[in-house]
Regions:
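Nucleotidyltransferase catalytic core that binds NTPs
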Residues: 2-238, 246, 250
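Phosphate/ribose-recognition catalytic cores of enzymes acting on nucleotide-derived substrates
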Residues: 227-282
Length: 282
């Protein structure tokens, strides 16, 4: 497996693969990899002969009061993990490679509407940072496909919108959320949880699953179900950002006849902001 840091090195290897007729998949990450990330790498391998994993802690998707400085940088450990995976190349650029004009003069890619609620409302500028860095990675790697996780449900919808709207020739594939044995969605931020908070954290998925089951069984009082779920989470000690039932394809408010729903939740427990979702097809 190769580890490259510069645009030139990346282009040299990509050119060789293209000459061989290989398809290239990209798995964008910020590092601090866990089993969930590795599952995305494996999914990428199922769709392409070559897999590039990018590791870049992107400053433009963090707010001023967020955890950019504290976010773990674990390239050495990540490299060891990826050597045992289906990855062919790690692309670990510096900020200057991704933003050659600097952060203040960087071009911003902004997707309207679908970014205005949920994580977009709670984290102003976050999705502009995500789409801007993903567009740059697409331009540098020029992958045939890219793989994102369902845990970041709104994010993968935003990236799909961007790719379609800009006619980017990149197929977007979504990988299933990978969970701990107790149901907690795997996340690099789970390590912020204290021991007692970690024992409480699975309640998030329990409440989410209960709401999903209610919808699957025909429940259609969305407002009541949202309110009851928020109360359960607050009672367990969560500071709830949102708990919302929406149309799965566009996050718009559903009517009672909608046959594909997504339940979205974000809540803070201690120093960790946890997000999760479940998709319900009726």
């Amino acid at each position: 497996m190769l580890v490259v840091h510069s645009k030139q090195e990346l282009e040299e290897h990509l050119a060789e693969w293209r000459r061989q007729g290989d398809h290239v998949a990209l798995v964008p990450t910020m590092g601090n990899l866990h089993v969930g990330h590795l599952s995305l790498v494996q999914l990428a391998r199922e769709h392409a002969e070559r897999v590039v994993v990018s590791i870049f802690v992107n400053p433009t998707q963090f707010g001023e009061s967020e955890d950019f400085d504290q976010y773990p940088r674990t390239l050495e450990r990540d490299t060891l993990r990826l050597k045992k995976s289906a990855a062919d190349l790690i692309f670990a650029p510096d900020v200057e490679t991704i933003y050659p004009f600097g952060l203040k003069d960087a071009t911003t890619v902004s997707v309207p509407r679908i970014t205005e609620n949920f994580c977009g409302a709670s984290r102003p500028g976050h999705f502009d940072g995500v789409t801007s860095v993903v567009a740059r990675l697409f331009a540098l790697v020029q992958p045939d496909l890219a793989v994102f996780g369902q845990k970041d449900y709104q994010q993968q919808l935003v990236i799909r919108h961007m790719s379609l709207d800009l006619n980017l020739p990149v197929a977007i594939i979504t990988g299933a959320t990978i969970r701990e044995e107790d149901g907690l969605a795997m996340s690099s931020r789970n390590q912020y949880l204290s021991e007692s908070e970690r024992s409480t954290a699975p309640v998030l998925y329990e409440v989410l699953s209960a709401a999903g089951e209610e919808l699957q069984n025909g429940g259609r009082d969305f407002a009541k179900l949202e309110s009851e779920s928020v109360t359960k989470l607050k009672d367990a000690g969560f500071d709830v950002d949102y708990f919302s039932i929406r149309r799965a394809q566009n996050l718009e408010i559903p009517d009672r006849d909608c046959d594909e729903l997504v339940v979205l939740v974000a809540a803070v427990l201690g120093d960790a902001r946890l997000i999760d979702n479940t998709v319900i097809t009726i």
